[in-house]
Amino acid sequence: MILNLHPLENLKSYISSRPPLVIFMVSVSGMAIAFLTLGYFFKMKEIKSPGMTEDWNIFLLRFNNLDLCVSENETLKHFLNETTPPESTVTSGQARSSTQTPQALEDSGPINISVAITLTLDPLKPFGGYSRNITHLSSTIFGHQIGLSGRDSHEEMNITFTLPAAWNSDDCIVHGHCEQVVFTTCMTVTAVTNVFPVTVQPPHCIPETYSNASLWYKIYTTARDSGTKNAQDYNPFWCYKGAIGKVYHALNPKLTVIVPEDDRSLINLHLMDTSYFLFVMVITMFCYAVIRGRPSKLRQSKSEFLPEKVALSDA
């Protein structure tokens, strides 16, 4: 018995007789391609972990919204180049282990964490600088000023910037005015443990050895968050005769929490298996359409209306 197949005719008749099934095949094919592409994406790209809402990149970027005012009216505090952390705080080295067990140290008091960060000081025209060597800038803020929410929004945070070199009025005298300066400072944040992220920390700096000045002078600054600029009680003379400081943190890819490679491989495997199954389903339906063609019921119904059949029935 010879089987005569007409694949193109069968395929055309299959498409014309079963359009819903054809649409289903196209949809399944699209899903298979989408799963295959998504699986390749998970395999080749590093994906940020959706379960970790805040890492150190996000935390340090919050300080970019702060404006620090260094005013001429502030008093200087002089101290020698020999400082030790207070007994009530934990040093930055101890803070590394504290982030791993935040519940155990939640009530242990504030801790110090020191990281390197960029600070720009933009003096306004009336600002004449300081005759003393300024090596430290300090400020006190609350969590809501950097966008923290919930209980953390009411937490008090002390920030101290240790400059690598002294900042004074010598350059102001040379140029006739004070120009903008950019420092890579050692920023020390003192706050309770629950304020800090529990992810991998950035490299720590040591404020006690960061500055090369022998005589240190600390000046206290006032901080203003970005939301205050749009408030009705905004004061345009907020930092008159002063210098405005801005913090800038450059994104560090090593601080972003990503999905582990094993998990990404498992996700890729599941997506690949699903796409292969869908492809097999589509290929099976396509082969059936090529071989079977138009449904048998339709062929029988048409054959009943052939002229020969009608003539025989009349006879």
Curated annotation (Swiss-Prot):
Disulfide bridge partners, by residue number: none
Keyword Transferase recorded: no
Pfam family, one: TMEM219
A GO CC term attached to the entry: membrane
Membrane-spanning residues: 22-42, 180-200, 271-291
Tree of life domain: Eukaryota
UniProt-annotated stretches for the region Disordered: 82-106
Alphabetical keyword list: Membrane, Transmembrane, Transmembrane helix
Classification via InterPro entries: TMEM248/TMEM219 (IPR039493), TMEM248/TMEM219_dom (IPR039587)
Chloroplast as UniProt keyword: no
Bias kind Polar residues: ranges: 82-103
Compartment(s) of residence: Membrane
Membrane topology: Multi-pass membrane protein
Family: Belongs to the TMEM248 family.
Protein name in the entry: Transmembrane protein 248
Organism in which the protein naturally occurs: Xenopus laevis
Gene that this polypeptide is encoded by: tmem248
